[in-house]
Structure formats: structure tokens, C-alpha cells
Amino acid sequence: MSSFAVNILENPRLSSLPSPCFVLEEELLQQNLAIFERLQQSAPIEVMLALKGFALFPCFPWLRSGLAGASASSLWEARLAAEEFGKEVHVYAPTYRPDDLPAIIPLASHITFNSLGQWHRYRESLKNTAVKAGLRINPEYSPVQTDLYNPCVSGSRLGVQAAMLAGNLPSGITGFLSHNLCESDHLALEKTLGQIEKLFGEYLPQIEWLNLGGGHLMTSQGYDMDYAIAVIGEFHQRHPHLRLIMEPGSAIAWQTGFLLSTVEDLIETPEFTHAMLDVSFTAHMPDCLEMPYRPEVRGARVPQTGDTVYRLGGSSCLAGDFLGDYAFDQPLQVGDRLIFEDMMHYTMVKTTTFNGVHHPAIGCLRRSGEFELWRTFGYEDYRNRLG
């Protein structure tokens, strides 16, 4: 739990927060932004916000001052970036629809293609435009152990392997995008740069920019920023003509807010007690089930012998919509509020209205300690998606 975070159970100004609710903490976001500002001041690299991980646009005015722009993976993300963030918009998608690309071109400064086939299909569309075209490359290295999140898994559909280029960089390609990390450290950054030089080094003199993608968890404890700055600087010394870019998503929103929920029922079984909540893991925190991982709950701990063991039950009818196990210092009661920590990245951008479950509101805890409610959802939001 952050030192800034306020215990909502003891603060009357915050006890009236709606439940469920995603709550961004402004102070923590600003602290993360300062880390990336330091990076850009100390190393020859520019940082973009990856909207696929964090697209909470009411806070874009704060981020705009310290970042170079935003990266998008679809027409709608590109439009959001252009309309709400401004500055440069870099677009990459695994495939482009023929009716989307003409709409993307006026919004984007850079468009990256996933395959040689996509580039050859659409290259004429970029003629007589100011858009810089790129290729996504596959460096054939990723430290990610979970295949669901590993873009370099054997047979990956993402990116061009060096063998596919066969020594010939297509005319018109001005840069490369390499996205092979996920919540990774400074050593993975170093290994990635080495792989790019090893497999694609012959093409680096022919391009203008290199985008190192996302997955650089520079805002986590244990990330050696000085080491990363040195690695980036040394790479740039070897390739001084290259404009270096990265586009973190999770790292910008890392540990900057929580999801508030309420205990609605308690179901006792011989093995454990189900604490039934007004949130759904499958609908509101899908990465918890997909990865899977056990999210931190404020005030909870791993059960020890003699503890009452709680399994947290989601609000949907999916049998597997639960997580556990947890223990608390005091027995839970119906009406208690639970806080899931670090729920700003890859949550709001992935939520669904599966089963018609109530979608969490969205708000912000400002530096002043005041809470601002930014968005609520109702029946019409569920209904209007379906017809």
C-alpha cells in the first residue's frame, strides 16, 4: 500500500465512494511520470503512452506534459490518442482493415506494419503523406514465461523475423518496432538490444527510428534505471542516427490506483468461506484469471494455520470467477469494503459487461485528498452494446 493511499474505511470524505469503483491516485501517477521524465532527460530516448494498457483520458493532460505522445493499436485508439492526448500518434496493429487505414493515416505520425504482406498491400496508401512507415520485427527473444503474453513464442504471428527479410529492407520502410517484453527488467532491455543488433544489425544503418515497444517496468521496485540509461546510451553511441522510442503502458500506471469492492454475502464451507463481491474477476480483472496471478488485497495476507480462509467470489455466473486464498486480521462481514491494489493497467481497457454485471464506476483521488467521480455506467451501456 502506498504512503499516499488513504484508508477509506477511516476517512469520512472517502467512505461514500461508489462500489464497485476504479480509483486512480493522482499523486502516484505523477510520481511515475517523473521517473519517465528523468529517463528522457538522461538518455537519448522518447517515451510514448501505450493506450492498450492504460487509456484513462481524463488524466491525459497530466501525462501530456512529460511524454512524447501516445501509441495505438487500432483506429479507435488512434482517434482517442489524436483527440485527447495530442502530440505524436504511433500506430501498430497485427492487421489493418482496408476501411480503417484511410482513417488512421490523417491521425498518425508513424504507422507500423506487422508483416511484409501488409506493407506491400498498403504501401501505396502512404505515398504523398507525411506518415513514417515501419515494420514490426521479431527479435526471437522474450523473457516472458506465459505463452499468452509471449510475442516471440515459436510460430508467433507477431512481427517479421530476420530470415523473412533475406537481406533486403523494403523501400519506404523508415523504422522498426520491437515489442517482446512484459513487465520486464533492465537486463531484458539489454538482451533485447543485443538481439536486435545480432539479427537486424545490417538494416539499422538504413532506418531512421527504432521503437522498443512496451513491457519495460521501469516504475517497479528493483528496476535499475541507471543501468538502463547506460545501456540505452551505449546503444545510441553505436547507432547515433537512430531516434529511439519506447511505449510503456503498464509501467506508467503501475501501482497508481485500486478497485474498490464490497462484500455482499458470506458462504461457509468446510474448506473455506466464500466472500461474495460486487465485482467480477472475469469481467473487471481478466488478467487475474488469464495469467493467472493473485492480486494484492489491502489488509489481507496469505493464510496461515488456524486462519479463516477466504475465497473471493466474483459476481458473474462463471464457475471459475473467483480468486484466493486470503486471510484477514478480523472476520469479514457483509458490507465490508475490499480494495484490490494496482488495478489501473489492463483492467479498464479490458472490462466487459458479461452476464450484465454492474460495471465499476471510475474516479480519481486527487492530490488534495478529494475524490472526483469521472464516470458511471448504467443499463443503457449494457443494452446499447447489443443492438
Curated annotation (Swiss-Prot):
Provide the alphabetized UniProt keywords: Decarboxylase, Lyase, Pyridoxal phosphate, Spermidine biosynthesis
Enzyme Commission identifier(s): 4.1.1.127
Q: Which reaction does it catalyse?
A: N(1)-[(S)-3-amino-3-carboxypropyl]agmatine + H(+) = N(1)-(3-aminopropyl)agmatine + CO2
Q: Cite the GO molecular-function annotations of the record.
A: diaminopimelate decarboxylase activity
Known pathway: Amine and polyamine biosynthesis; spermidine biosynthesis
SUPFAM superfamilies in the cross-refs:
Alanine racemase C-terminal domain-like, PLP-binding barrel
Q: Which Gene3D superfamilies match?
A: Alanine racemase, Lyase, Ornithine Decarboxylase, Chain A, domain 1
Does the entry feature the keyword Lyase, yes or no? yes
Q: What class of enzyme is it?
A: lyase
Q: Which residues carry this modification: N6-(pyridoxal phosphate)lysine?
A: 52
Task: State the deletion phenotype.
Answer: Deletion of the gene leads to substantial accumulation of agmatine and CAPA, and lack of APA and spermidine.
Which cofactor names does the annotation list?
pyridoxal 5'-phosphate
Q: Which GO terms describe its biological process?
A: lysine biosynthetic process via diaminopimelate; nor-spermidine biosynthetic process; spermidine biosynthetic process
NCBIfam families, from UniProt? nspC
Q: Which PANTHER family match?
A: CARBOXYNORSPERMIDINE_CARBOXYSPERMIDINE DECARBOXYLASE, DIAMINOPIMELATE DECARBOXYLASE
Family the entry assigns: Belongs to the Orn/Lys/Arg decarboxylase class-II family.
Tell me the function of this protein. Decarboxylase involved in the biosynthesis of spermidine via the carboxyaminopropylagmatine (CAPA) pathway. Catalyzes the decarboxylation of CAPA to form aminopropylagmatine (APA). Can also decarboxylate carboxyspermidine and carboxynorspermidine, but not ornithine, arginine, lysine and meso-diaminopimelate.
Q: What is the name attached to this protein's record? A: Carboxyaminopropylagmatine decarboxylase
